[in-house]
């Protein structure tokens, strides 16, 4: 069901639909936005991983497991 076929589109909806997809400037702008978002998500993921790693390190330090795994004990 297309809103423009019903005559219910606003001027903003029509403007959005009129964006040429082969415009090099629009493609460059979209690429920058996407790269920025991917960087944001990667930094967020890495930050979350560091918190998990710190928690695991603390648990390992508090454990009472004996022996040194490097020596095969």
Swiss-Prot record:
The modification Phosphoserine is found at residue 36. PROSITE patterns: IQ. Residues 47-59 have a biased composition (Basic and acidic residues). Pfam families: IQ. Keywords: Calmodulin-binding, Phosphoprotein. Residues 47-73 are annotated as: Disordered. SMART domains: IQ. Transmembrane segments: none annotated. One of its GO terms (molecular function) is calmodulin binding. Residues 26-55 form the IQ domain. Belongs to the neurogranin family. Acts as a 'third messenger' substrate of protein kinase C-mediated molecular cascades during synaptic development and remodeling. Binds to calmodulin in the absence of calcium. This is Neurogranin. It comes from Serinus canaria. The lineage of its organism: Eukaryota, Metazoa, Chordata, Craniata, Vertebrata. The gene is NRGN.
